Amino acid sequence: MSMDFSPLLTVLEGDFNKDNTSSATEIDTLENLDDTRQISKGKPPRHLTSSATRLQLAANADVDVCNLVMKSLDDKSEFLPVYRSGSCAEQGAKQFMEDEHICIDDLVNHLGAAIQCSSLGAFYGVFDGHGGTDAAHFVRKNILRFIVEDSSFPLCVKKAIKSAFLKADYEFADDSSLDISSGTTALTAFIFGRRLIIANAGDCRAVLGRRGRAIELSKDHKPNCTAEKVRIEKLGGVVYDGYLNGQLSVARAIGDWHMKGPKGSACPLSPEPELQETDLSEDDEFLIMGCDGLWDVMSSQCAVTIARKELMIHNDPERCSRELVREALKRNTCDNLTVIVVCFSPDPPQRIEIRMQSRVRRSISAEGLNLLKGVLDGYP
């Protein structure tokens, strides 16, 4: 049976997650980030990427409706994101550069005849390597191919992404030309029309800028995080001084096969990503993806405040990514730095007005409070 998926329809797996919502409690939570940032090991130089395009989801595929959940996006909304990305990577204080990243604003042109969907969207990734460059380079080169070649793609994108992370881990181990003791975290963003799917394994982070608010779309997989520590100890691992088995500062990674058992066996160091999906709206202005070299020295809200201020001035995501890197270096980050900024509109963010309720008693909106917190976080 042939079906047409317009921008107002999307194909999902059954485990749909609702969009993030913000509250005063959430704002406080985002500001009280985990201060225990472990420094990864050592880091061959990088490049900048910047391009722009407008895309819209319209895919034809033979589907078994029993295996799909079709969710209508907001029928009243005519919003379609315009993908404009920029990136910046710097070696920083490290001896070597081990980060890799990828920015693809137009998947159709990039993949060509390799896929039968007439129009997909965009794909971005940040890969923070450690113990050498082999793992990060391998994942950057292959992860998108593993996703689109998976039998679940494009009908069950989340399943395909999870499978691709595991396949990348196994295929890396099988490549005799590579140092399989090297490893990498992996953070990817896959966009179909207005549907954004974030996958993360490690301590890179994706943050959505929503009218000045920072909405975290990924969790930092640190060994001393409660959920990760429980999982690690259940599988026979230990967390010592914030390090997995006293060796690694992340709880999830691709590679590092010197710390893993036979293929298919449960292991404290997991390559499995956590996924978060959301439907983009007019309020969603940009996405920041960065390695821990950025987040070690600034909060998510601070990064959003800086990015928004820069975009209001020049509306250039590449310059914006460079400014975030510059600010992190200014704050003496000890790690490699990689930042991607993806804008969802051709226009710059609009100024947010803070309205006072009265002369006697004044209040500030949640959006204004977020902006103020970002400024107080140390950005002039």
From Swiss-Prot:
Disruption phenotype: Decreased salt tolerance. Binds 2 magnesium or manganese ions per subunit. It is found in: Nucleus; Cytoplasm. GO terms for molecular function: metal ion binding; protein serine/threonine phosphatase activity. Its EC number is 3.1.3.16. InterPro entries: PP2C, PP2C_BS, PPM-type-like_dom_sf, PPM-type_phosphatase-like_dom. It comes from the Eukaryota. Its cofactor is Mg(2+); Mn(2+). Keywords: Cytoplasm, Hydrolase, Magnesium, Manganese, Metal-binding, Nucleus, Protein phosphatase. Pfam families: PP2C. GO terms for biological process: response to abscisic acid; response to salt stress; response to water deprivation. Induction: Induced in shoots by drought in roots by abscisic acid (ABA), and both in roots and shoot by salt stress. SUPFAM superfamilies: PP2C-like (SSF81606). One of its GO terms (cellular component) is nucleus. It catalyses: O-phospho-L-seryl-[protein] + H2O = L-seryl-[protein] + phosphate; O-phospho-L-threonyl-[protein] + H2O = L-threonyl-[protein] + phosphate. Residues 84-344 form the PPM-type phosphatase domain. Its main location: nucleus. Mn(2+) 1 binds at residues 128-129. Transmembrane segments: none annotated. Mn(2+) 2 binds at residues 128, 292, 335. Expressed in roots, leaves, stems, flower, and trichomes. Confers salt tolerance by triggering the expression of stress-responsive genes. Belongs to the PP2C family. This is Probable protein phosphatase 2C 27.
